[in-house]
């Protein structure tokens, strides 16, 4: 019951896209269903291309999308057609996918699962699950608590709770800098790192100043800094590859679903109810970007020409210049429930969402909506 309630509490904080992920978990019966889902390979599905897809990325020229029930979709024609991956060993919802080359990629999802592919997404292997992740976090917390520091002791109690709950906590974001160095973050402050391509993992939870275990939705590295975004307006930054983190003060108390660097020292953070905030000085000062609608922003993307795209859960696209000072709506909408975006090799925009994966032709990415 505790796992079920945890899933429902998580669901209450998420946007349309992530809400679907949490709801799928709660409906599965919580931790009681987790072992079966971790052991059950994803099934062939004739409607896979129209299923809930939660993330999409590039693997060289190939596109890879992941979503509900362990479904992984591949496209070799810039998103015009899709087919299922040959082998996915789990049936849990997969929440994000990233590749560092044409062949090497990782995906994360429910039940603390981390998957790895070495063949461009055709087949996948489990590198980590929730039970192993909880044990790693608890071991690190025990070592940190040996000093008797009150904060470390509190972290130990929280880590022991993760072990007792079982593998019911989802990873929600990941980033790999190369074939070796990667980071994953998730619900209740989950955060781990690897330096050997996922063969072994280390807890980051004692390094991130995140008391109370706020949900962490995104992690990315750009311009030498590692950025983590989460609920209650939290942003964390590491300039040393994750060895230490500092909290970036923000004026917003709601959820950030992502953040990305802008210019030499700028930041763009986006999240619930149309909140988009910009800083020119690495987070020392912030100004709100006016977007006209209070609709949750679910994805952001830097295009090949340097322009920035924001997308909200209604499917509206907004285009801004490289400085992110102003965004204008585009004429071409996407289906509601958009979860992620990527630019295909031919310049088209490809987006994952509640209705599968959509494609927008390159010419429409500059056409502004009529006022």
Where are these regions (language model features)?
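Residue-level hotspots at or immediately adjacent to binding/recognition sites across diverse folds
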Residues: 2, 25-371
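Bacterial N-terminal signal peptides that target proteins for export
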Residues: 2-14
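Bacterial N-terminal signal peptides
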Residues: 12-23
């Amino acid at each position: 019951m505790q796992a079920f309630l945890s899933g429902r509490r998580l669901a209450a904080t998420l946007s349309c896209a992530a809400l679907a992920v949490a709801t799928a978990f709660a409906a599965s019966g919580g931790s009681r269903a987790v072992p079966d889902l971790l052991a059950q390979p994803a099934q062939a599905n004739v409607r896979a291309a129209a299923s809930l897809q939660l993330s999409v990325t590039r693997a060289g020229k190939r596109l890879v999308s992941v979503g509900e029930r362990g479904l992984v979709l591949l496209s070799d024609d810039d998103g015009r057609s899709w087919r299922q991956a040959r082998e996915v060993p789990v049936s849990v919802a997969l929440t994000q996918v990233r590749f560092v080359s044409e062949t090497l990629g990782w995906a994360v999802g429910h039940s603390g699962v981390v998957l790895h592919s070495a063949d461009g997404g055709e087949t996948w292997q489990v590198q980590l699950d929730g039970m192993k992740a909880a044990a790693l976090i608890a071991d690190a917390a025990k070592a940190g608590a040996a000093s008797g520091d009150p904060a470390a002791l509190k972290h130990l109690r929280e880590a022991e709770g993760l072990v007792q709950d079982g593998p019911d906590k989802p990873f929600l974001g990941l980033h790999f800098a190369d074939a070796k160095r990667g980071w994953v973050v998730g619900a209740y402050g989950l955060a781990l790192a690897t330096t050997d391509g996922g063969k072994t993992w280390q807890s980051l939870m004692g390094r991130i100043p995140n008391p109370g275990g706020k949900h962490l939705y995104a992690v990315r590295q750009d311009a030498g800094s590692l950025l983590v975004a989460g609920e209650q307006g939290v942003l964390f930054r590491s300039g040393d590859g994750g060895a230490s983190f500092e909290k970036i003060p923000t004026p917003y108390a709601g959820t950030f679903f992502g953040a990305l660097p802008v210019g030499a020292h700028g930041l763009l953070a986006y999240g619930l109810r149309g909140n988009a905030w910009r800083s020119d000085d690495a987070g020392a000062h912030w100004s709100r970007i006016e977007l006209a609608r209070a609709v949750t922003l679910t994805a952001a993307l830097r295009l090949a020409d340097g322009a920035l795209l924001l997308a909200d859960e209604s499917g509206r696209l907004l285009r801004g210049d490289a400085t992110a000072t102003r965004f204008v709506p585009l004429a071409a909408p996407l289906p509601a429930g958009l979860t992620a975006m990527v630019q295909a090799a031919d310049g088209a925009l490809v987006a994952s969402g509640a209705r599968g994966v959509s494609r927008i032709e390159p010419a429409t990415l500059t056409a502004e909506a009529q006022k």
